[in-house]
Amino acid sequence: MERKTVLVIADLGGCPPHMFYKSAAEKYNLVSFIPRPFAITASHAALIEKYSVAVIKDKDYFKSLADFEHPDSIYWAHEDHNKPEEEVVEQIVKVAEMFGADAITTNNELFIAPMAKACERLGLRGAGVQAAENARDKNKMRDAFNKAGVKSIKNKRVTTLEDFRAALEEIGTPLILKPTYLASSIGVTLITDTETAEDEFNRVNDYLKSINVPKAVTFEAPFIAEEFLQGEYGDWYQTEGYSDYISIEGIMADGEYFPIAIHDKTPQIGFTETSHITPSILDEEAKKKIVEAAKKANEGLGLQNCATHTEIKLMKNREPGLIESAARFAGWNMIPNIKKVFGLDMAQLLLDVLCFGKDADLPDGLLDQEPYYVADCHLYPQHFKQNGQIPETAEDLVIEAIDIPDGLLKGDTEIVSFSAAAPGTSVDLTLFEAFNSIAAFELKGSNSQDVAESIRQIQQHAKLTAKYVLPV
């Protein structure tokens, strides 16, 4: 069979480049379009070059030789991308037509809506224009969820301080204030005290002005205020060590939801995730409830052909509470870990769906559990504050070393990989925690509880050597 051509809108996020490009290129010819060259790391650029038959970069972002250089790491691209949505759509269409693309995909949350519009114009399978907008704008998302037969929660659009005051009056506390257009829990804030609520709103609103997003990202209101979803851990798990929420990965094919795998989590720092354990140890009844909720949510958004990453709160009486869902792959190493544990290559499966619809080899339910577990974990400054190594008043630190002492792992759990910020790395402790991962590690073991306890031990006992900047 002749290899089909897939246009990849290359940017940050989703399935990591170290898996995506090799997996995709094994079956498809890849054309990579880079709308934000400044958002590509050196290793990402090398993989794009290695596995693409052609690479197109937006020429408007090359003003000097320095613009051809790529940094070693990026969490969030802070340079401006000032092209409106329609111009981005036209760029995608032009490149797709130039190479006769049979499908278009991206791993980046911020280009989901322009890509959907380009797919529609070209007659290619995609998420669907309205569905993509529903999945990108969290106000529209919550409206769709509330109509989809899942737990309905109070919510209100927020643009101004007056809107926030009205939301606070209507919803009460605890209340979640969430940016409608971002990802990675950036800016998500729990409001519990009415006395300080307005100060919190102003703080988050001011901070978000410093976070650049492409001009093509559109929304009706910058915030959504929602009632807090209260978890009930003991109704779902029979052992300690996990969190009261999970994520479930799936695929939409011609408007039908296909669940793939559920990830357990370890306790968060605020709303910042700390680790994902693949697969989940939840019992079959619990998994069935989660799958039913995810199906209603994603089909309720109207999604047609795309990957889905759905986050669900585990509430009282085993009621799933929809947090949000994205029309893209999960980030971190969750997609590679599904392949490690189950042998399913979701990167290839998505492209199969985009090219062939339901003729792709889709699973008929959650993948069966294999005899081992893989955990994808990060360490943040807050872990070292909690274990007393970073002074609570510190505003900055310069890392000298991060080490994991011997004797922390439980059962047959082993460290597969470990990486830490390089010596001399400066960390601004005033940033949202999600920006400040300072170490990452992967664990593997035959017992999920041993893996979870090993994570907890590492969080409590990892050794940080650093210099601190304290307020005068």
Swiss-Prot record:
UniProt GO molecular function: ATP binding; L-amino-acid alpha-ligase activity; metal ion binding
Cofactor notes: Binds 2 Mg(2+) ions per monomer.
Classification via InterPro entries: ATP-dep_AA_Ligase (IPR052032), ATP-grasp (IPR011761), ATP_grasp_subdomain_1 (IPR013815)
PANTHER family associated with the record: ATP-GRASP ENZYME FSQD (PTHR43585:SF2), FUMIPYRROLE BIOSYNTHESIS PROTEIN C (PTHR43585)
Gene name linked to the record: bacD
Phenotype upon changing residue 75 to F: Almost no effect on catalytic efficiency
Binding-site residues for ATP, renumbered to this chain: 138, 178, 184-185, 226-229, 268
Binding site for Mg(2+) 2: 311, 324
Keyword Nuclease: no
Catalytic reaction(s) noted: L-anticapsin + L-alanine + ATP = bacilysin + ADP + phosphate + H(+)
Pathway this chain belongs to: Antibiotic biosynthesis; bacilysin biosynthesis
Effect of residue 328 to K: Loss of ligase activity
pH behavior: Optimum pH is 9.5.
Organism name: Bacillus subtilis (strain 168)
Keyword check for Ligase: yes
The protein, known as: Alanine--anticapsin ligase
Physiological role: Part of the bacABCDEFG operon responsible for the biosynthesis of bacilysin, an irreversible inactivator of the glutaminase domain of glucosamine synthetase. Catalyzes the formation of alpha-dipeptides from various L-amino acids in the presence of ATP. In vivo catalyzes the ligation of L-alanine and L-anticapsin (epoxycyclohexanonyl-Ala) to produce the final bacilysin antibiotic (L-Ala-L-4S-cyclohexenonyl-Ala dipeptide).
GO annotation terms (biological process): antibiotic biosynthetic process
Chain sites annotated for binding Mg(2+) 1: 109, 182, 324
Lineage: Bacteria, Bacillati, Bacillota, Bacilli, Bacillales
Temperature-dependence annotation: Optimum temperature is 37 degrees Celsius.
Domain ATP-grasp: 142-355
UniProt-reported outcome of changing residue 309 to R: Loss of ligase activity
Subunit structure as annotated in this protein's UniProt entry: Monomer or homodimer.
Classification via Pfam families: ATP-grasp_4
Top EC category: ligase
